[in-house]
């Protein structure tokens, strides 16, 4: 309840420690899922992944598919595209059309971003090799 109050007041830095304690004591995974969402909002991506995975493992979450979407987004931010797509595909199996549509959009976005990142890396490598050849010439 206290964490919800802080969260609603946009006092996320105060909500997180309260939720961390509540998640440890809770018999349900939902508190970890909420904590993972807040971590993601705060760009604490690795913490987000750990919290959401802990919540899913613990079970008793409101929407497993919604948690998988957020977990996919966290992996996407880390450029773990394969794991992100895996989570999005799992979420896309949900009966809720809204979640399914969102998950499928994320899959396409992750696929495109993965190609873009690989192409940038190839381009960067090519430029570095070209500069090295010029220096050695």
Which residues does each predicted region cover?
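Residues that mark the junctions of alpha-helical repeat units in TPR/alpha-solenoid scaffolds
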Residues: 28, 64, 100-102
